């Protein structure tokens, strides 16, 4: 955990539904941060039924990184939320759902999103080191797969990016202090 650091400031009133749901993903990321985990958060929002009927968008699942806490390489925010959403809906197909995540999904998470048949993915910050929704490769829109997801990126980019930057700066500072001790 980064001690003594201010939490990123976020606009008090989101202007769009995407911003409102991304704010909830940021809240999830802060839970990871409080555990000393990489601050990545995710929510899954159902927007329509399997029959295609539009419904009032509702959060059906939340997740945040817990890899270190659980000693589990699969405990990413997206995987946790996808598992919960499948349980809520009683089906592995998450058609009619949008995934909101503070950092661009890695290859594993992008693959799970495709397998779950999600309609859309909304990303806060892109991930130049492991991003699989356009930064390094784009598994979410790979035409050879049987499913592609629409991507919206950059929703509340600044607070999402700042949270990651401050987290890793804190890790580097702690390592430097340890070496100098």
Predicted regions: what they are:
Residues 16-17, 38-40:
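Short loop/turn microsegments at loop-to-beta-strand junctions
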Residues 1-32, 49-54, 105-181:
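Zinc-dependent deaminase
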Residues 43-48:
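Short hydrophobic alpha-helical segments used for membrane anchoring or interfacial signaling
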Residues 69-79:
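A short, polar/charged loop-to-alpha-helix boundary motif
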Residues 91-103:
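Immediate flanking context of iron-sulfur cluster ligation sites
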Residues 60-61:
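A structural microfeature
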Residues 15, 67-68:
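A short, polar/acidic, helix/strand-boundary loop motif
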